[in-house]
């Protein structure tokens, strides 16, 4: 039986062998691995990119005070980004399941069409959910647009839900019963609940009861203003961090019930406008560098298109 941390190590070793850079999590609150710059921004432009990383993900509304056996406000995804998306991406994914010890002949693996969209990031793609014996464990996406910009070449994204995958592999019904790491020399195993249960209880209390809506509204406006200011200085990466801060602040306000249905759409639109502007700013920043990681023919083609668009 693989422990939670061994599942991560196995996936890292597997994707390392496929030529992926093993990156570290983005060090800010994000709702999904897609928000990491290694996916959202690197999907833009003609430069090839292969990376894999664990991303802690926060969704304040999903908190259940540690009482729900499979719903968390803080959880982990394992993200793989392949650009351009290889023709054998499905085989590569199935190979990763075999590396984890799955017998593909003995398990019911289904690909259910499920196109993906993230309105706040202005991103969408063609995709599939992967169901393993009736439980969704992975999302496949071929990015079509990011920040409202068409993706050329297409980026392939594989997102593993680590807790769900581990629950199936370990045969447990409650996420807190997962073995995080094995005890040695007679020490007891460390459980997922030992590491994270208190955090779920306390963060749920903060998200639903103790966050300060007035402070959060002020913070949202400040992050929005700073993002716009940074883009005026052509600082796409710091601006993107402000967008992520604004997005998480919105999620906290949403969890607190401080935003009405009509206001919700307005706030999502404000974040989307920022994300689109940052995406364009980042693409321009790579263009100013001449897309140094791209094959010359690809770089020249996109540079010519951008120049034509600027002259129009």
From Swiss-Prot:
PROSITE patterns: AA_TRNA_LIGASE_II_GLYAB. Its main location: cytoplasm. Keywords: Aminoacyl-tRNA synthetase, ATP-binding, Cytoplasm, Ligase, Nucleotide-binding, Protein biosynthesis. It is found in: Cytoplasm. It catalyses: tRNA(Gly) + glycine + ATP = glycyl-tRNA(Gly) + AMP + diphosphate. SUPFAM superfamilies: Class II aaRS and biotin synthetases (SSF55681). The keyword Nucleotide-binding applies. InterPro entries: aa-tRNA-synth_II/BPL/LPL, Gly-tRNA-synth_heterodimer, Gly-tRNA_ligase_asu. Tetramer of two alpha and two beta subunits. This is Glycine--tRNA ligase alpha subunit. The lineage of its organism: Bacteria, Pseudomonadati, Pseudomonadota, Betaproteobacteria, Nitrosomonadales. The gene is glyQ.
């Amino acid at each position: 039986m693989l422990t939670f941390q061994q599942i991560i190590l196995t996936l890292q070793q597997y994707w390392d062998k496929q030529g992926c850079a093993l990156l570290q999590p983005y060090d800010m609150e994000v709702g999904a691995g897609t928000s990491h710059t290694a996916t959202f921004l690197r999907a833009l432009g003609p430069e090839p990119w292969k990376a894999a990383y664990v991303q802690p993900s926060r969704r304040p509304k999903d908190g259940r005070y540690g009482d729900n056996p499979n719903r968390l406000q803080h959880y982990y995804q394992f993200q793989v980004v392949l650009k351009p998306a290889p023709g054998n991406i499905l085989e590569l994914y199935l190979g990763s399941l075999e590396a984890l010890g799955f017998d593909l002949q003995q398990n019911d693996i289904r690909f259910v069409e499920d196109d993906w969209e993230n309105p706040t990031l202005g991103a969408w793609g063609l995709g599939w959910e992967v169901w393993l014996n009736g439980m969704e464990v992975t999302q496949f996406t071929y990015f079509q647009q990011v920040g409202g910009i068409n993706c050329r070449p297409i980026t392939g994204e594989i997102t593993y839900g680590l807790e769900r995958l581990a629950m199936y592999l370990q045969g447990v019904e409650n996420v807190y019963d997962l073995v995080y790491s094995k005890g040695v020399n007679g020490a007891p195993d460390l459980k997922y609940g030992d590491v994270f249960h208190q955090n779920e209880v306390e963060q749920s209390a903060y998200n639903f009861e103790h966050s300060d809506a007035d402070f959060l509204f002020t913070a949202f406006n400040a992050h929005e203003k700073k993002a716009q200011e940074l883009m005026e200085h052509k600082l796409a990466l710091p601006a993107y961090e402000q967008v992520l801060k604004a997005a998480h602040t919105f999620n906290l306000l949403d969890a607190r019930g401080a935003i009405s249905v009509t206001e919700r759409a307005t706030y999502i639109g404000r974040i989307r406008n920022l994300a689109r502007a940052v995406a364009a700013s980042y693409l321009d920043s790579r263009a100013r560098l001449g897309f140094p990681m791209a094959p010359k023919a690809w770089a020249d083609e996109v540079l010519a298109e951008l120049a034509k668009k600027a002259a129009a």
